[in-house]
């Protein structure tokens, strides 16, 4: 199949998903002789309108994995406002060095339901968003070598297709999708209400620049507070 465009589409709060998805899309675009394009939906305003593709598009679509699944706050946007219209897609998941569980297969399923035809998929380790030690420095050079290998193999597969595949790409995970992973303490007990944790801040060090509020993916920071 001939592709006119290869897209890097991603949510990447800490930059690791962006690093993987953009690198993969750039290589695939070069191999396919196609235009390279990007769309980042990090901010709420980026998720307000529809995002539509077509048969001439190959979309490398990436999200992080939270608690073993696609982040639940992103699902309404991906499910309701992203339209494949027959485009090819590659779901990509970044996880913080525990396990991607059903994050990749869930993303694949949602993209298929959106009208994409998935042709490959990949999950990669990225430094954990809560810690500088979990998956520190990942994706590293070895990870990126695998990203590049997947990009080349994906482009080669697309070149060999006569038409869009009817069967979704095989990826690891359980279907039906399992519940979100429950974190546990050192004694194996479930940690309750961990989502209600609040960061400890030092207001004396705040210079009131407003950068944190402008960049917050969920618009959860009040710039006046």
Spans of model-derived segments:
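Extended, small-residue-rich solenoid/repeat segments and analogous flexible loops
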Residues: 179-200, 205
């Amino acid at each position: 199949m001939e592709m006119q465009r290869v897209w890097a589409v991603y949510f990447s709060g800490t930059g690791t998903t962006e690093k993987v998805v953009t690198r993969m899309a750039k290589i695939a675009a070069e191999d396919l002789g196609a235009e390279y394009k990007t769309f980042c939906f990090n901010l709420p305003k980026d998720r307000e309108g529809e995002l539509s593709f077509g048969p001439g598009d190959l979309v490398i679509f990436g999200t992080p994995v939270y608690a073993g699944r696609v982040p639940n706050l992103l699902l309404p946007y991906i499910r309701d406002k992203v339209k494949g219209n027959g485009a090819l897609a590659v779901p990509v998941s970044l996880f913080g060095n525990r396990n991607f569980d059903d994050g990749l297969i869930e993303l694949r399923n949602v993209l298929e339901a959106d009208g994409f035809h998935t042709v490959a998929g990949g999950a990669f380790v990225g430094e954990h968003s809560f810690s500088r030690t979990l998956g520190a420095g990942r994706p590293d050079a070895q990870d990126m070598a695998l990203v590049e290998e997947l990009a080349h193999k994906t482009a080669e597969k697309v070149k060999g297709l006569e038409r869009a595949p009817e069967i979704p790409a095989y990826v690891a995970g359980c279907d039906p999708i399992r519940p979100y992973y429950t974190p546990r303490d050192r004694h194996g007990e479930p940690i309750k209400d961990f989502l209600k944790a609040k960061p400890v801040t030092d207001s004396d060090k705040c210079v009131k620049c407003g950068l944190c509020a402008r960049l917050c993916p969920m618009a959860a920071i009040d710039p006046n507070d």
